[in-house]
Swiss-Prot record:
Organism encoding this protein: Jannaschia sp. (strain CCS1)
Annotated spans, Disordered: 251-276
InterPro entries (alphabetical): Ribosomal_uS2, Ribosomal_uS2_bac/mit/plastid, Ribosomal_uS2_CS, Ribosomal_uS2_flav_dom_sf
Protein name: Small ribosomal subunit protein uS2
GO CC terms, sorted: cytosolic small ribosomal subunit
């Protein structure tokens, strides 16, 4: 495997260059804006391309060292691409709603994850059948709520080593928590956003479905490349694996790697979106 390649044409076709209406711009993004067209800011893809490449490199290196990546995208059009991409590369995601303290109060979040696993086990072994109807319905409601909020991080086993964010305005709390703990942030930053707090900026449209799908696919493939490197370092002969089984081997290796990796300690639609 190798770091994923992408072309300027792919960025154009996905609408990565379309920003927001000119009156909604954030001056902090001025250096990344090429110009405007019909009242819409146009991002400079000659800057986006190398900055996206750098972000992919960081993702690959993080995973190759056994690090965890947390995909964060809770807006409607990002929810499915974020979940699919994270699952494809055996990483983790938050795509429902960012819960305050997810990173800075990890101990409490871990307790909630344990609760979710406990309910899942009781559901699987039939233990819920011995409860009253009211108790059973209460547990089922808790299960649905916890799965939606924490299902994507239930196997993370500790704090992530890097987070990848779609829409820094919407996910400002996640970024603030990551910065407080010194966790690097890779993020897509649109023309109406501030890049403050983002370590690896990807100037680009954060609303168009095709653009979001492209970012998520590239980040996922970079993570897979990193995990491939990790397996090779561990002595796994990837060339001997059957075609199509590399990703399965990577996915099987991920839980063990997550358990072994030391957990950081907390200190604490295809067109420019006018009114996202």
């Amino acid at each position: 495997m190798a770091l994923p390649e992408f072309s300027m044409r792919q960025l154009l076709e996905a609408g990565v260059h379309f920003g927001h209406q000119t009156q909604r711009w954030n001056p902090r993004m001025g250096e990344f804006i090429y110009g405007d067209r019909n009242g819409i800011h146009i991002l400079d893809l000659t800057q986006t391309h190398p900055m996206l490449e750098q972000a992919l490199q960081v993702v690959r290196e993080t995973v190759a060292k056994g690090g965890r990546i947390l995909f964060v995208g809770t807006k409607r059009q990002a929810q499915k691409p974020v979940a699919d991409a994270a699952e494809r590369c055996a990483q983790y995601y938050m795509n429902h709603r960012w819960l305050g303290g997810t990173l800075t109060n990890w101990k409490t979040v871990s307790n909630s994850i344990s609760r979710l696993k406990e309910i899942d086990e009781k559901t699987a072994d039939g233990s819920l059948e011995g409860l009253t109807k009211k108790e059973r319905l209460g547990m089922e409601r808790d299960q649905i709520k916890l799965q939606a909020s924490l299902g994507g991080i239930r196997e993370m086993g500790g704090l992530p080593d890097l987070i990848f964010v779609i829409d820094v305005n919407k996910e400002d709390l996640a970024i603030a928590e990551a910065k407080k703990l010194g966790i690097p942030v890779v993020a897509v930053v649109d023309t109406n956003c501030s890049p403050d707090g983002v370590d690896y900026i990807i100037p680009g449209n954060d609303d168009a479905a095709r653009a979001i799908a492209l970012y998520c696919d590239l980040i996922s493939r970079a993570a897979l490349d990193g995990m491939s490197t990790q397996l090779e370092t561990a002595g796994v002969d990837l060339g001997a694996l059957e075609e199509g089984s590399v990703e399965e081997a990577i996915a099987e290796e991920a839980p063990a790697a997550a358990e072994e990796a030391p957990a950081a300690e907390p200190a604490a639609e295809e067109t420019p979106a006018a009114e996202a």
